[in-house]
Amino acid sequence: MSFKDLHIISMKSFSRDMIDHVLNTAEMLEPIAKGKTKSDLLKGKILGVLFFEPSTRTRMSFETAMMRLGGDVLSLGSVDASSIAKGETLADTIRVVNGYANAIVLRHNKEGAAQLASEFSSVPILNAGDGAGHHPTQTFLDLYTIRRESHLDGLKIALAGDLKYGRTVHSLCYALSLYGAEITLVSPKELRLPADIIEDLRSRNIKLTEIEYIEDAIENVDVLYVTRIQKERFPDPAEYRKVANSLLISPELLEKAKPELKVMHPLPRTNEIDPRVDNTKHACYFKQSFYGVPIRMALLALVMGALE
C-alpha cells in the first residue's frame, strides 16, 4: 500500500484499510513522538507550512512531527508579510513553494482551497482545514485517540456542539461510517449537520440519530466528542449569540455517563467544557492533542515515501 505523493484532502478518499494503515504506522512512530528515540527518516526533506488562518495545535504538531523525523520546516509566517498581501493567488503561491518543499501543509479560510491547491501542486498537499469544509488530519488523530483510549468497531459516539460549521465533525462522520459506528448528533436546530452530509451518511446505512440535548444521550455513549461554536464563521453576530451557550459539559452531567466514557474535543475550547472536567477520568482532549504528533509523523513519512 503506497501513499507516496498522495494528497490528503478529504476522508472520502480513504478506505478503512488505508486508515488502519495510517493508524498502525502512527503507533509504530509514537515512541519517537514522545522523544524516547530519535529518527532521521525525513532528513533532507522540507515541509512547507502555509497557514491562512490561526492555529496552535495543528501547526505546532505538524512542525513537531517533521522535526521529530529529522526534517526541516519552512513556514510562511504572517500572511500580511508575504506576497499574498500584494494579491498573489493561491495557485501561484503553491507553484512557488513547490520549488522549496517536499510537501505542503495548508490551512485556508475558503472551503475547497486544499483541493484547488492540489490541482497546481507537484508535491503532496495536506489539508489542515479549509473553511467549514474538511480537516482530514484531525480526523486521523481523532480515530487514533478513539482506538487508543476506547474502541472503533461498534462505537457509540455523540457529536455535540457546532455541527454546521465544525469541519472536524464533517470529516469524522465519514470516517466513522467505515467502522459501523452509531452516531448521535447533538446540536441546536440552527447548528445541525448539513443536510447533504446527513443524506450521504444515511446512504451508507449508518445508524444516525439527531437530538437537541446531550442529557438525552449521555448515558449510552462510549465517546462524547464536543466542538466549540465557531463564532468566526457566523455571518450574523446576532445568530451566534442565540446559540453561544447552548452546550455545557460538566462533572455533574458526566455522573450519568458510563464509567469508561471518554470526552474528546479538537480544541480550542471556549465555555462548552467546564474546566472541572479536566480532572475527571473522562477527560481525553489533552491526550488527543498529543496524538496529533504521531499521526502527522505517519502521514508525512507516508506521503514523502519514507515509509510504505
Curated annotation (Swiss-Prot):
Residues reported in the UniProt entry to bind L-aspartate: 86, 167, 228
GO terms of molecular function: amino acid binding; aspartate carbamoyltransferase activity
Signal peptide from the UniProt entry: none
Binding site for carbamoyl phosphate: 57-58, 107, 135, 138, 267-268
Keyword field: Pyrimidine biosynthesis, Transferase
GO biological process, one term: 'de novo' pyrimidine nucleobase biosynthetic process
Keyword Amino-acid biosynthesis in record: no
Gene3D superfamilies: Aspartate/ornithine carbamoyltransferase
Protein role: Catalyzes the condensation of carbamoyl phosphate and aspartate to form carbamoyl aspartate and inorganic phosphate, the committed step in the de novo pyrimidine nucleotide biosynthesis pathway.
Description of how the protein assembles with itself and partners: Heterooligomer of catalytic and regulatory chains.
Annotated family: Belongs to the aspartate/ornithine carbamoyltransferase superfamily. ATCase family.
Protein name: Aspartate carbamoyltransferase catalytic subunit
